[in-house]
Amino acid sequence: QHDFSLAACISMFVLLGVSSLGITAGYHRLWAHRAYEATLPLKIILMIMGTFAVQNSILFWASGHRTHHRHVDDIDQDPYSINNGFWYAHMGWMLRNYPAAEPDYKNAPDLLNDKLVMFQDKYYVPLVIAVHAGILLPIGWLVNDIWGVLLLGGLVRLFLSHHVTFFINSLCHMWGKRPYTDENTARDNFILAILTWGEGYHNYHHIFQYDYRNGVKWWQYDPTKWLIWTSSKLGLAKNLRRIPSFNIQKAELAMKFKYAEQDLAIYGHDVNTDIAQMKQRIAQEYEAFTNTLNDWAKLKEQELQAKKAAMAEKIHQMDHKLKVDFQLLEHRLAHHRECLETLVRNIKKAPVSE
């Protein structure tokens, strides 16, 4: 009989974090989405961590993920479409040779030209063996529990790591909220974000896939974001891509208007005011919101024209003016949000009478 040592149990959780972050920070946000740039030492570290997760090569994983984003929810072209059912999206797509899951590297010319990516792809199986032997055996020897580390830090960790990743393809397209877009099935889910090292804010990710952050709010749990940010401060990463705050607020507010209309349609009979008046006020707020977006588009055009201009002084003057104007527009968006939230609070959410 073999009792697992405390050290072997700890190794399972630590190594789960190592391998999972190799997928989230490396395979996903670096190679699949190019959300930031990494130095060669960091790339090598992330490649080793990702190889330790045993989720196929960077090339295969990232290319398939790009296809998922391009054809999300399409039952014929999305490799793990949730519209084919939970188990298909979770892991069924890997168990048979479905056409949508066949690798097609036409969407990954950058990866095909990446020497490190191609090295890992060519020697993937030997690298998996070498990485596991090089990590698990020394740890097992140091804690005097080789079998415990091999079983917990090896097999059990792999089981947990795989299913945590699979949850993103399955549960994150079924369970949660859609605060940014309803054009696909992706959801934001705080519980899944904890389990998936920040990847659970999937609704945000599907509308803003090139942002290095998934948890964009300061309070949202996203260890992958923190790792990338810390790496940038250490000089190991640079050019972290961030979606402008205005774009994020615009998406959120557009969804709030949709939900306000839905709430009014469902609970309107219980509103303690004239329903026609409530609809008119929401319509007026939406018109003001649309005008703000139009003004924002005009400012972006002015910014583009200023950058095209040859005169450096003109660019400097325009930059200052545009910054002020953009700030004013952000304040207007915040005002629209406050007005809309006040309107929504007036909609009494009582059960619909039968």
Regions found by a protein language model. Name each.
Residues 1-166, 212-354:
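Non-catalytic, topology-defining segments of multipass membrane proteins
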Residues 24, 141, 170-172, 189, ...:
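Generic hydrophobic/packing signal
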Residues 29, 170, 174, 206:
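Catalytic glutamate of the conserved HExxH
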Residues 111-116, 175-201, 207:
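Active-site-proximal inter-transmembrane loops
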Residues 165-179:
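C-terminal accessory segments of proteins
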